[in-house]
Amino acid sequence: MINKKSKIKVKKMNHSVKIILRMGVYQLLYLDRVADYGVIDEAVKMMKKIDRRSSGFVNAILRNISREKDSILDLDDSYKNLAIKYSYEDWIVDRISDQYGKERTSNILAALSIRPRIFLRINRNKLRDGENLSDLKKYIVDRLEKDGVIVRDRHILEEAIEVENFKQIENKDLFKSGYISVQDISSMMVARALNPKKNSKVLDLCAAPGGKSCHIGEMMKDSGSVLACDVFDHKIKLIKAYSNRLGLTNIEACINNAMVLNEDYVGAFDYVVCDVPCSGMGIVRRKPEIKYKKKEDVDSLPKIQRKILDNAAKYIKKDGVLIYSTCTIFKEENIELIEEFLKDNKEFKLESIENLPFERERLDKGYLEIIPDRDDMDGFFICRMKKI
């Protein structure tokens, strides 16, 4: 949008000019609590405090956009205009259009622009003798509501609670004492798809900050072992702090490079989880900066993902289960990569996913594509494979 109205392209603008213009344009087009003149005036004042010389430029661009606001908002949803309307790099919109069709692309981008909901995960490890999860959930909901939190239980997963008006969670007693954790509903699906048996040996190769590992530990009722790995020491500390807060004793965090084969892990685990580094194109509403990723950076990811998956395959016992997951909707990081992996590794086969609230025909394929426009949650890909 800014590029259309400015002779100086965004990439060449001073960083502060770019940020102020983006904020101003968003307010002009999509917010209505402040009149246009007020938005422009505040943007110019802000710019003067940083760089007085650029204030006239900011004023001119924003006034130009304000004058043409109605025609801009009336842009049709042809894919050529979607990059402007939703503020994406052109190549991202083109790729979504190629993979999901031009008509659906607008719906996907709109869904990725909706304010994300907040979900809490209940710690099953807090169940007392004779108590079921419904009892624990009621106890937590009652305490949340007494604290002024709005609770919306949509019954997607029994251990999940949707909340509003929940601020400074780290200071809440329920959080500090390990009853709840913040985790998006799509992310919770990974441990659910794994569905580990009690006393199993589990490896989480890309575990930080620890949400999925701890969810797995909770599902096994603090039995067995979950080895949660990451390549950075500061992330290992995050995992340890997470599991300690929840009171889990079956989580062990250690440094390990998922890109390098670890001979000590070969054939040692009942379950392995690969929640690999990805483009994040399913969680744009949580991390809007993803809209501006460079094509070459995203195109380099499948090679990294495949290397991690190949190593993970070697760590599983016979009849063990391998979970591959991402938080992207790009097919080259998801099903296309899995198809290539299965072609090269005949000892693995897709296995029907249980324990998830989706139509049977979607789960029987052995992989689940969660797309924001259809499923009303963050975009995710989860694949379950068995070693035969």
What are these regions (language model features)?
Residues 1-388:
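S-adenosylmethionine
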